[in-house]
Amino acid sequence: MKPLTPRQQQVFDLIKSKIDDTGMPPTRAEIARELGFRSANAAEEHLKALARKQAIEIIPGASRGIRILLEDAANDEQGLPLIGQVAAGEPILAQEHVEAHYQVDPAMFKPQADFLLRVNGESMKDIGIMDGDLLAVHKTQDVRDGQVVVARVDDDVTVKRLERKGSTVLLHAENEEFAPIQVDLTSQHLTIEGLAVGIIRNTDWM
C-alpha cells in the first residue's frame, strides 16, 4: 500500500471514528462538512484516492458505501511525527510532543525528513512558508549560514534563516514586518533542532 498523505489520513481517521462511534461510515456531505471541503465532490475525490491506495473500498450506489480495508492505518505510527507544543527543557521528539503520525514518505525530501512541524504565523511567508503549513525537518545540528533552520532559543522554538556573527546569532524572518531575532550566545541558550527540507501545504493534502 502506498503511504497516505496527511489529508487522506484525516479522511481515513474520520471514517474509522464514525464507524467506531455509530456503526456506520459517514456520507460524502458529512465528510465535507467536518473537514471543511467545499463540496461533497471534493470528499469523493479523497475517497477515490483512498480506494486507489487500498485503504478503503467504495461500494457503488450507497451514500454510506465505504468499507475500511486497512484497519490499522489510523493507529499506524509509521511515517513522520507531527510535533506540537514543545515543553521547556524537553527534546523536540519526546513522545509527549507528538500530535500525530502522517503517512508521508521521509525519502521524498532531501536530505530525508525526520519530523513535521506546524508553521504558526507569517514570518517566513516571502519564501513560501505559510501559516498552517507542515514544515518537513531533517534533524541535524550541522547547518550553514543562510539555511532555514528550526531553532530553539531558550524555551521558544522558531523557524528562521540562520546567520552567525561571532558570539551572536541572527535568526532572520522572510517578511519585512518582522525584525531579526538576535541571540547572544554568552547569555542565551540556542539549540539547532533541524534543517528545513520542504513543506506540505493544506491545499496539497490530496
From Swiss-Prot:
It comes from the Bacteria. Keywords: Autocatalytic cleavage, DNA damage, DNA repair, DNA replication, DNA-binding, Hydrolase, Repressor, SOS response, Transcription, Transcription regulation. Its EC number is 3.4.21.88. It is an enzyme of class 3 (hydrolase). It catalyses: Hydrolysis of Ala-|-Gly bond in repressor LexA. One of its GO terms (molecular function) is serine-type endopeptidase activity. The record marks A88, G89 as: Cleavage. Gene3D superfamilies: Umud Fragment, subunit A (2.10.109.10), Winged helix-like DNA-binding domain superfamily/Winged helix DNA-binding domain (1.10.10.10). GO terms for biological process: DNA repair; DNA replication; negative regulation of DNA-templated transcription; proteolysis; SOS response. Residues 28-48 bind DNA. The active site is at S123, K160. Represses a number of genes involved in the response to DNA damage (SOS response), including recA and lexA. In the presence of single-stranded DNA, RecA interacts with LexA causing an autocatalytic cleavage which disrupts the DNA-binding part of LexA, leading to derepression of the SOS regulon and eventually DNA repair. Homodimer. Belongs to the peptidase S24 family. This is LexA repressor. It comes from Vibrio parahaemolyticus serotype O3:K6 (strain RIMD 2210633). The gene is lexA.
